[in-house]
Amino acid sequence: WYHVEFIIVPIKHYFDRGDFLFGGEIMKQGCEKYIPFTPIDITDRQWPSKTITHPPIWCSVDLRDGNQALIDPMNLKEKLEYFRTLVDIGVKEIEVGFPSASETEYEILRTLIEKNLIPDDVTIQVLVQSREHLIRKTFEAIDGAKNVIIHFYNSTSTLQRKVVFKKDMDGVIDIAVQGARLIKQLTDELKAEKDVNIRFEYSPESFSGTEMDNAVKICERVMEELDINEDNKIILNLPATVEGSTPNGHADQIEYFCRKLKNRENAIISLHPHNDRGTAVAAAELGLLAGADRIEGTLFGNGERTGNVDIVTLALNMYTQGIDPGLDFSNMNEIKEMFERTTKMPVDPRKPYGGELVFTAFSGSHQDAINKGKEYMRTS
């Protein structure tokens, strides 16, 4: 497929023609079609000399980003079971849907609230575009919730500005600012009536394809409009909506953004890696080194195209560095069974930690070494 955000050319007919076979004309021209990812101008990068010393804040987007990627989306019963599993694992921030998008998305949120299914220490997150009627619908949907993150976004990449919205950067900033202004107004009105904890999250969608100075600029304007301060921190979510660079390039983007952002101490920097190049876990780990505080991902990496970052792999990798990730995957088989049943998707047998073959060796020499290792541990 062509590397263009959300403008994906169907490739089936190319496969049918055989052009994607080695020697096909399309493959021959591949290196000529693509423009190399532009590196970030940062010569004194600090992240390579750092180590991860603590887990990030975890946010599951299974019920929203993961669910919308399913051929057969989950029904209400399945979503509720999935939500309970996420709570049991220990996820404290859960994006439950896009309530202004459809009645089914609205239904899961209202069910969770009205049946009092959300633990007091869990914050639900709702996604909304920076559009007035959708924002108002979202505030109707969260009525009665105790702890909510309002996650609003608009696209900022060069390509989307030119092709989709036909706006310059000032026009895109205005969309974000208008949305932030309304969200603050509705939040103030709701808090005056009810005891509710509302936090803000803003995503410059397609951050990975946006000029870094423009990404910083739009986030700073949103912070100003929301009156962000140390006691009212904003989550700035930086999506690799389409993964376009190597993981070190992504880390450079995050470090550059963190350095340039005014009042960095008033922001929680969140990552939302996708796996188009197969390196979402590495990009997330290096992004944490570069200054990120929070990760949005899914169980086993379910998500659009090649998936979101896999929270299971990312979390369990931390044990190898002596870090408790704060998530409990001790019931891996039960978690995997729930995932496969509700999503109707299999977990790859080679999937790190959760795959059925990850503790299996077929090589005779490997089996011999494993047996000797077990014997050594038994007798030492």
Predicted regions and their residues:
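Alpha-helix-loop-beta-strand connector modules within alpha/beta enzyme cores
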Residues: 105-126, 177-185, 254-269
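N-terminal capping/small domains of soluble enzymes
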Residues: 22-132
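Alpha/beta enzyme core
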Residues: 76-89, 132, 136-201, 205-264, ...
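Glycine-rich phosphate-binding active-site loops on the catalytic face of alpha/beta enzymes
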Residues: 292-307
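C-terminal helical cap(s) of enzyme catalytic domains, especially alpha/beta-barrels
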Residues: 303-325
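Hydrophobic faces of well-ordered beta-strands that scaffold small-molecule active sites
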Residues: 58-61, 94-96, 120-128, 148-152, ...
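A mid-to-C-terminal "edge-of-domain" accessory segment
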Residues: 27-62, 322-380
